[in-house]
Amino acid sequence: MSEAPKKRWYVVQAFSGFEGRVAQSLREHIKLHDMEELFGEVMVPTEEVVEIRGGQRRKSERKFFPGYVLVQMVMNDASWHLVRSVPRVMGFIGGTSDRPAPISDKEVDAIMNRLQQVGDKPRPKTLFEPGELVRVSDGPFADFNGVVEEVDYEKSRLKVSVSIFGRATPVELDFSQVEKG
């Protein structure tokens, strides 16, 4: 008895903004053509992010890889044609157009670890970096410009060096109180 070929992960390029629909269509095509044994998971890796709009905290999802869908599958002519026949699929990434290359196990592990880390804590939608120029939009230092010194994603706070009367003064601010320069 021969062992079934191993399912590997492939990256499929989709029209940007249609990743979810492509993933859903692909799942439906797999069922419709009775090819479940050739396919594993089909996913669009996302993370939950928090953005502050109009003073309100809102949760939304951000895609790790906009424009791409990850597909676990056994690569053969039938599975290749099935994926390529799904509307809004532009093709596979890696390898050649007729012989796509799977992503490495190391890359798969990195993606899965990132998905697990994301699990509980939503991240801020806007990411700040030390040295970046920001403008204070709220509070006693509104309309002042400053430079980010430290970022605390756990507490959603920044330490910003603001120039007050010609002197650089460190000020602790909430993410909602600043906007990118």
Curated annotation (Swiss-Prot):
Residues 130-161 form the KOW domain. GO terms for cellular component: cytosol. Keywords: Transcription, Transcription antitermination, Transcription regulation, Transcription termination. It holds the Pfam family KOW. One of its GO terms (biological process) is transcription elongation-coupled chromatin remodeling. Disulfide bonds: none annotated. Participates in transcription elongation, termination and antitermination. In the absence of Rho, increases the rate of transcription elongation by the RNA polymerase (RNAP), probably by partially suppressing pausing. In the presence of Rho, modulates most Rho-dependent termination events by interacting with the RNAP to render the complex more susceptible to the termination activity of Rho. May be required to overcome a kinetic limitation of Rho to function at certain terminators. Also involved in ribosomal RNA transcriptional antitermination. Monomer. Interacts with the transcription termination factor Rho and with RNA polymerase. Belongs to the NusG family. This is Transcription termination/antitermination protein NusG. The lineage of its organism: Bacteria, Pseudomonadati, Pseudomonadota, Gammaproteobacteria, Enterobacterales.
